[in-house]
Curated annotation (Swiss-Prot):
GO terms for biological process: tRNA modification. Catalyzes the methylthiolation of an aspartic acid residue of ribosomal protein uS12. The gene is rimO. This is Ribosomal protein uS12 methylthiotransferase RimO. Its main location: cytoplasm. It comes from Aeromonas salmonicida (strain A449). Keywords: 4Fe-4S, Cytoplasm, Iron, Iron-sulfur, Metal-binding, S-adenosyl-L-methionine, Transferase.
Amino acid sequence: MSNTKQAPKVGFVSLGCPKNLVDSERILTQLRTEGYDVVPSYDDAELVVVNTCGFIDSAVQESLEAIGEALAENGKVIVTGCLGAKENQIREIHPKVLEITGPHAYEEVLGHVHKYVAKPTHNPFTSLVPAHGVKLTPRHYAYLKISEGCNHRCTFCIIPSMRGDLVSRPIGEVLAEAKRLKEAGVKEILVISQDTSAYGVDVKHRTGFYDGMPVKTSMVALCEELAKLDIWVRLHYVYPYPHVDDVIPLMRDGKVLPYLDIPLQHASPRILKLMKRPGTVERTLERIQKWREICPEITLRSTFIVGFPGETEEEFQMLLDFIDKAELDRVGCFKYSPVEGAKANELPDPVPEDVQEERFQRFMELQQQVSIRKLARKVGKEMTVLIDEVDEEGATGRSFADAPEIDGLVYLNGETDLKPGDLVKVRIDEADEYDLWASLIG
């Protein structure tokens, strides 16, 4: 008879954005390091941790439903994440939740787990936890979170109230993590935060150290260092500060991917002012033109809100005109939705839901035509593709122009001998409004 005691099982549910995913990875890594068996289900788990999202109402609802399901299936639930910042709201609906913490409260979550499920005395997983930690993404790409919180006070957003003001991670720590990811076989690093271009602002861009060398705590210096890893580096959530212009030459020179995820939100000066967002249409179009002159290959992704309180038909038309002129490559659009605690809720003249929907459809139809034009220009061109999946029908991957989950795909029909993480040269054969079809070269 074996005396080996089975490791205690902890169920884990991760909801929300990539930034929340990174928080989940950190908690999971520590749980595994301490000897807990983390399982993706409620079966036999001694308790369940739910990492929630609370950014928009639909995310709040999804989080509350996940908590309810975990309570029904297991009974012992610890809640963390963005919705955890609203403890009263959770307890009103789910009073039986054991403990609640806000976002990035790693030590508190672990302390709560220890309280209800004793830390194992023997850890069978010590040698199984990789140096780069537990990852929830495929092995060939990973998110690298460089900061927490945000100093902006956009009226439609409640992130600062949940995650606090900007706190930049030490640059040496960030670069050391990036190196571990590369050594683990990661081919693409996706740099994320609430506000990537503000990296280092809170510490006045002080000089840090990595490998004994001084490195400035700034987005540009970070990009220059990450480039030395010789893997794909993709920038997300880049607030349109003037110094973003300094990253474009690095893209031209192949140091980071020529891809910029830069949320612009609207084109009307009055609506932008109500949102507390920067920029004017003329200046933004000038910058886009300049970026394309410096780096003709650059892919621009952005997000916009239609139906913001007070938005007139004329102001919406300004947004459509901007979309037509800017010819952005990838665009996300959201209908304004009141978020509990957002300042924009107090603004007059809410836009009726049917008008929001009609504007959303017009916006997406126009952007679809822009996307069709842009992708059609890629037919016949050669490019490098990172393979994500392979099945009996062939391989699916992404070019530098496509971030995982949110952008388009490149299909390689019949190519069943490839494997995820392969970087291959292809020629583009066909395109539709979102995706490409290609053939291997050679």
